[in-house]
């Protein structure tokens, strides 16, 4: 029987603690109890600030516990394209911060003793076209030259050492990328926050933020509170309560499926090194073995619709998986689920302040790494820490033209990307 909730929830069900009364005031109010909001809350509480976190759902029920569990910290543009478009200084700054963010997440998990199956196994990125392989090989050379990441290209003749598939024309391995269990990671972060004195109000949607002389009034479905500072951390689940941010983020459905248990010999063939996996499609597939090595977890952004309702988009995703792994043609699915990632015009994470409200958003599908990193950076900004600099602050954060939060254009964009992928353009 197929279950329509994330596979990750089997090991880490979403918490549903009793609601507590809203405090009349606090130092900082945070909207969003995912990785981003809780990372900020932990930093602020440890600095002695009183913090209330509000979420319209259960804590971590949205993207934080629905992802593929691939800790890449990738940016949408390759380093080669960034060099060409932005120049060496900016390109290196963006990519270097990604390296720092990955290391920060690893240190945090170890320091807090979070048991989330964190495993730095690396990631193989498959080249969908021969020309893509040449680009990946060049990318590996550039990453090693500028950052010494030990990335390497894998020709098609040797790719079975990395993946049991003939769907690709070689690829690249990034050994600096880890896998983890995202719901367990969130549970560990939530425990840190609660243990540090943070108050989390789940199922408490924020309806508006009003600036006042001495701070802000935050309106919720359960009452009002006053805060000296406000941090918005909803990312792909941003709603009408924060219209300025909503006009700058496009929520894109990202789908995932989990296979039934597989024979160990099949797993050894398909994922011989148990790496994280991806490819070079514009509508790229991301997939991996489960942490216990018993299943394939497969994701993609091919819905082409504003909401996911019914089996059609999952059937398409299932067919994509079988195209890569024909061995799975007769294997059943144990779980199917979906969530939103947040895209923006520049395809870069953003750390911003507007009218006194702090924002971190636009992780473009790589939130496991960027959410904690920029959530913490935002907290340091609130604290007035002059050393909390980031390459992702102070850059233009443009609104999407003719858009107010309803991505009416998304089906056409996805159809166009499917066309480009089909012809390798």
Where are these regions (language model features)?
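N-terminal Rossmann-like FAD-binding beta1-loop-alpha1 element of flavoenzymes
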Residues: 28-53
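Extreme N-terminal leader/targeting segments of oxidoreductases
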Residues: 1-28
